[in-house]
Amino acid sequence: MATKLILTDIDGTILPYGKKTVTSRCVDAFHAAMDAGILVGPASGRFYPWIPEFFGGDASCCATAIATNGSQVYLEGKKALQKEVDSACVRRAMEVLSNVASTGLLLFEGETPYLVQGTRDDLLVCFPRYGETCVERDDVPSAGITKANVFIRGDLERTREIVALLNREVDGLDFDVPQAQFSNVMPAGWNKGAALAWLLEQLGIGRDEAVVFGDAGNDLEMFSTVEHSVAVAGALPEARDAARWHIGAVEDDAVPAAIEALAAGDWPFAR
């Protein structure tokens, strides 16, 4: 089957941690895929309006996109689907976190991150950009929450422990582990994989005609949705084990190299 859709996680997959933009080779690879008639774009926990800057402002690279961990889907640069996080469920999560030291919760209305629980000092350690730009507030809006995140100061093991606690104690929401100290908050049962399945159906693309790349726990459902899942070197163990195919590291532009090959009609993966 010819490849018709390519989706890739951003952080740790095409964007090394600490970098602000992907490489020019990555942008060029996306355009090569588009020129070959392949839909290509990111599948990220990031809020959609922030994504173009990772591609140097080239919005065509995210005209097809899964954003906010599946809560937003874009086609031809237009929002095709949006899910919201339930406010009552968020309050329950805050109740659970109130008994856990060095944790907190962020909500997003539009592009603004609001710190509704926890301290800015802890957030600065866990996710410096949000710590620098967030606005502190006491209330939880009754509707319109497009994105929420939990931050957990500590190592990956502690992050997994607190995320497991939240998944046990909070109905109506799911929590994942994309990296140490941070978790995406999603409507129960909805994630990158659910969004990808919806997208495939809308486009009439088979699960054997899509290739997805990732490195973390929030990519697992996406990996299980299609036949061709690819983990980069250095992926979290759960992502590495779930992927069908394995390639080199983000620092070596392994994903752009694979996209270049797919755009040329080659198959770059081997066991």
Model-based region annotation:
Residues 4-19:
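Asp-based phosphoryl-transfer active-site loop
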Residues 60-61, 69, 169-171, 225-226, ...:
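Short, structured coil segments at secondary-structure junctions
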Residues 21-122:
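Active-site phosphate-binding/coordination module
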Residues 62-68, 82-83, 127-128, 229-233, ...:
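Short hydrophobic/aromatic-enriched beta-strand-loop microsegments
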Residues 100-104, 108-225:
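Conserved acidic, metal-coordinating active-site core of Asp-based
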